[in-house]
């Protein structure tokens, strides 16, 4: 079903001489949360990727900045590290964010 998710951006700072990592809210967006199925599911399992979900959302300019290492998706109490952002097949109408749950 459709629901809000929060995309967060990793911020790295140095405090008292030590590197500190924190996550700041970047973009709240309305997504359709979809489980993997069929060929996509088997490919993920072969690559040892478990607890992977697709977050399908409407395209917006802010989503173009997503490089996968610096962003994550927060859905309720669950956190997903971003492993792919697919802008391609929907001709800039939709973006599919693929996230793996951090457990």
In which residue ranges do the predicted regions lie?
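Short, conserved turn/kink motifs that form compact alpha/beta structural patches or helix kinks used as
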Residues: 19-103
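Active-site-proximal polar cores
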Residues: 1-20
């Amino acid at each position: 079903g459709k629901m809000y998710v929060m995309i967060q951006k990793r911020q790295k700072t140095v405090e008292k001489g030590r590197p500190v990592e924190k996550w700041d809210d970047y973009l709240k967006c309305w997504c359709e949360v979809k489980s993997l199925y069929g060929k996509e599911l088997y490919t993920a399992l072969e690559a040892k990727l478990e607890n992977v979900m697709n977050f399908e959302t409407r395209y917006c300019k802010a989503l173009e900045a997503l490089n996968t290492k610096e962003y994550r998706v927060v859905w309720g109490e669950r956190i997903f590290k971003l492993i792919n952002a697919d802008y391609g097949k929907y001709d800039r109408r939709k973006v599919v964010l693929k996230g793996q749950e951090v457990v």
